[in-house]
């Protein structure tokens, strides 16, 4: 009996110190596969007593889970819809243009002293074959906005859901595609592509962590946020 009482008191003490609990983390399947494993390994070494539950899936479902209180934290790209949540910036990434190595557009790129990438004007996409994503993917909304804003008329549009497949099609000379910078870090294909930034406003995109409006994060959740920030920056800087 005394042993049970001691265990109960120890658990209560841990909760008070915010060192025991559960963390339910949501993240898209695509971002999870190359970004999350290293974060989880470091977090569980730091907080072994936390019940860490990961939900990877599509952002439509994950957003609903966050609103319904089924998630504590959600990693996603900043959109107008995220204004209804508490958010913190994790890192910023470029929206890149992937171009075949032997494509004439490579000759039209210009040096950008403030970037690791050379730059292309969106107008050069007129008449080109573009590989766009499906309408329900967040990247497609950005693609459509760019084409509309800069009055780009593609010669042909291919629609592919898989980001890896899109980039591999570019490598084979089948078109040009848009891709988030973070996604390119773990692409492995026998043929290379060239990546460029676009000479547009807001060419960098915010990757954020969101949680319910009005919530304050306990220490063990705050630790996860800081790890996500660190590993995000390391990913983009090839560390």
Locations of the language-model features?
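Alpha-helical "hinge/linker" immediately C-terminal to small N-terminal DNA-binding modules
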Residues: 1-20, 229-233
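Short beta-strand-centered segments that line the small-molecule binding cleft or hinge
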Residues: 15, 38-42, 59-101, 106-109, ...
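Central regulatory/effector-binding core of bacterial HTH transcription factors
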Residues: 20-83, 151, 159-160
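Short, well-ordered beta-strand segments
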Residues: 22-26, 74, 131, 177, ...
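A late-sequence structural motif
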Residues: 35, 194-238
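Hydrophobic hinge/microswitch elements
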Residues: 58-62, 67-70, 76-77, 138-194
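Beta-alpha-beta core module
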Residues: 83-89, 93, 117, 164-213
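Secondary-structure junction motif
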Residues: 105-107, 111-150, 217-225, 232-236
């Amino acid at each position: 009996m005394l042993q049970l009482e001691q265990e109960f008191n120890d658990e209560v003490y841990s909760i008070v110190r915010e060192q025991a609990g559960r963390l339910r983390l949501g993240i898209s399947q695509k971002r999870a596969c190359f970004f999350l494993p290293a974060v989880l390994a470091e977090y569980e070494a730091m907080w072994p007593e936390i019940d860490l539950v990961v939900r990877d899936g599509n952002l439509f479902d994950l957003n609903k889970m966050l609103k319904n209180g089924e998630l504590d934290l959600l990693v996603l790209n900043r959109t107008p819809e995220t204004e209804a949540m508490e958010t913190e910036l994790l890192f910023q990434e470029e929206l890149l243009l992937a171009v075949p190595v032997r494509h004439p557009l490579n000759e039209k790129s210009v040096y950008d002293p403030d970037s690791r990438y050379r730059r292309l004007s969106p107008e050069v996409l007129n008449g080109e074959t573009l590989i766009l994503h499906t309408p329900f993917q967040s990247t497609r909304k950005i693609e459509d906005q760019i084409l509309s804003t800069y009055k780009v008329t593609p010669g042909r549009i291919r629609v592919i859901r898989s980001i890896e497949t899109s980039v591999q099609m570019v490598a084979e000379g089948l078109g040009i595609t848009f891709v988030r910078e973070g996604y390119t870090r773990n692409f492995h294909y026998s043929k290379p592509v060239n990546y460029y930034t676009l000479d547009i406003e807001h060419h960098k995109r915010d990757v954020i962590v969101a949680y319910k409006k009005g919530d304050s994060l306990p220490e063990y959740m705050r630790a996860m946020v800081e790890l996500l920030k660190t590993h995000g920056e390391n990913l983009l800087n090839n560390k």
